[in-house]
Amino acid sequence: MPAIALREALAGKAEVITPDLPLHPKEALRYISNLIACEQPDALVGNSCGSFYAQMQVPHVELPALLGNPYFKMTEFLKPRIGAQQYKSPRKDGHQQFIIDEQLIAEFAELEAHQFDHYHPQLKDRVYGIFGQQDTLAHFEPLFREYYNKVFHFPGGHTPTAEEVRQYYAPIVEKNFLNRL
């Protein structure tokens, strides 16, 4: 629900596109790439797995990005969760269940191994990270800092509440992305 909260927080200031992404990572990256080509956004914002995808897109599209609690090692998250799962946010297609299996984990492993291959130093100050101080799932701030300089914190957990999105995420987007337009 962070995407919906961001759309609401920036209403009248920016159009926030909140797509349902495909489950399989290569399909999701193709979908995002096509969406960027069609919509021509001014910035990318993602949370968790969405941050994993956004940071892989940045070198190709040269957009600034805000990565919320980026989960750079999705395989670590997925392995103990093999089986049927539920999406946290309602999906437009109504399908709330998905399956985590070894094939899906292998697909993420392939991308993880190459996720920083296209990184270049010009991105150091164009990609922002925001990390929940109570996040018990993703602890990738040190890895983020190996590549990027802009780091922020908020007091919440891995999935920010709507209030945390309004109070912490939206101001970063407004100050750093909208004012540059």
Predicted segment positions?
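Active-site catalytic motif of lipid deacylating hydrolases and related acyltransferases
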Residues: 1-38, 158
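Short, highly selective alpha-helical patches that border small-molecule cofactor pockets
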Residues: 2-3, 7, 54, 140-144
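A general structural motif
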Residues: 13, 41, 62, 124-126
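Glycine-rich phosphate-binding loop signature in dinucleotide/nucleotide-binding domains
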Residues: 37-40, 180-181
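Conserved alpha/beta-hydrolase fold motif
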Residues: 43-44, 65
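Gly/Ala-rich beta-loop-alpha elbow adjacent to hydrolase catalytic centers
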Residues: 45-54
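Aromatic pocket-lining residues of Rossmann-like dinucleotide-binding sites
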Residues: 57-61
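The alpha/beta-hydrolase serine catalytic core
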Residues: 64-181
